[in-house]
Amino acid sequence: MPLELFDTADQEVRLVETPPAGSDTPVGMYVCGITPYDSTHLGHAATYLAFDLIYRILLDNDHDVHYVQNITDVDDPLFERAARDGVDWRDLGTSQINLFRSDMEALSIIPPKDYIGAIESIDEVIEMVKTLLDEGAAYIVEDAEYPDVYASINATDKFGYESNYDAATMAEFFAERGGDPERPGKKNPMDALLWRAAREGEPSWESPFGAGRPGWHIECSAIATNRLGHSFDIQGGGSDLIFPHHEFSAAHAEAAHGVERMAKHYVHAGMISQDGVKMSKSLGNLEFVSRLTAAGHEPGAIRLGVFANHYRGNRDWNAESLATAEQRLATWREAARAATNREDAIAVVEQLRAHLSADLDTPGALAAVDNWAAGIDTTTDSKEFTEVGNIVVAAIDALLGVQL
């Protein structure tokens, strides 16, 4: 069943443009990864769970998927946390990357084909920055001490198309989310950093435009387009990345490669709050995946708790969310042990496909299985799923990533 998703750039739900089903050409999907300085919290997990659903639906539609994810393993938050804890930033990054991968595996999230760190893509970034400089889309600030390289916001005539934000909103988010509008020497306050000239105490790499390290946005531009092509199918992440990160990543790639759009579809997942308050490190109200699984909560219940609300909305997580999900899991298992009506089983599988293909309508998908389960007489002592029950069990595993 063809997949439709909301496109942030076009502000509408529309069909995802893919190569023909069964072809040798994969669907290209790039999702921004973590900065590895803390454990994986539920906000991270919810984003990757949304794109895991997309991956599963594409596989169900007989598509191969080339899934790429980056790791921002050289960045200020990582350095700051390492300094605070008195550890080497490389060791901190490695430990958190390993924990992240372990959490994703625990949640049955299909791993990317390419999992690329910023450090290992330094040469790719340097090449793209050089291209932007050669094309006049970037410049070096006149600063003898720190000759940083910036991308001109005017390098493309479509800047702003991905986020659809007005100038005031862009300026606000640029300042709040890693931008440096007051940096002396910039031609425009909104010009984005491409290459940070070497500073004492910071890692740096040699380049034709001086020693330094990559800016945040250009890392994703280089990693994505070097693996998926200059214009690929799906670019994704959390809604907090819509601007500036995804807007600038697209602008850098489009200016460097001369394409209209870096991605055909821009997809974003909403934020997660805890008991009505946005999860944040500063508030200390993060719900960590590793703690939930260590406490004995099944990964399938965590997935169902997240899927109870639509991926694009900002969602709340609390103890009731998990309790409801665990009860749902138990109810579905009971139904699968007693199911005998093959037509009903086949029908609910098709309903699952239909809901998930309609912009990941997980509430509708879960309700469809609930309705199927409610119609089954579960007075049985059997501990095994019936042959008919296994039809639904297999679909729930393949499409929702939930094992009964």
From Swiss-Prot:
Keywords: ATP-binding, Ligase, Metal-binding, Nucleotide-binding, Zinc. Zn(2+) binds at residues 32, 220, 245. It holds the Pfam family tRNA-synt_1e. It catalyses: 1D-myo-inositol 2-amino-2-deoxy-alpha-D-glucopyranoside + L-cysteine + ATP = 1D-myo-inositol 2-(L-cysteinylamino)-2-deoxy-alpha-D-glucopyranoside + AMP + diphosphate + H(+). It comes from the Bacteria. Binds 1 zinc ion per subunit. One of its GO terms (molecular function) is ATP binding. A motif ('ERGGDP' region) lies at residues 176-181. A motif ('KMSKS' region) lies at residues 278-282. It is an enzyme of class 6 (ligase). A motif ('HIGH' region) lies at residues 34-44. L-cysteinyl-5'-AMP binds at residues 32-35, 47, 70-72, 216, 238-240, 272. GO terms for cellular component: cytosol. GO terms for biological process: cysteinyl-tRNA aminoacylation; mycothiol biosynthetic process. InterPro entries: Cys-tRNA/MSH_ligase, Mycothiol_ligase_MshC, Rossmann-like_a/b/a_fold, tRNA-synt_1_cat_dom. Its cofactor is Zn(2+). Its EC number is 6.3.1.13. Catalyzes the ATP-dependent condensation of GlcN-Ins and L-cysteine to form L-Cys-GlcN-Ins. Monomer. HAMAP family: MshC. Belongs to the class-I aminoacyl-tRNA synthetase family. MshC subfamily. This is L-cysteine:1D-myo-inositol 2-amino-2-deoxy-alpha-D-glucopyranoside ligase. The gene is mshC.
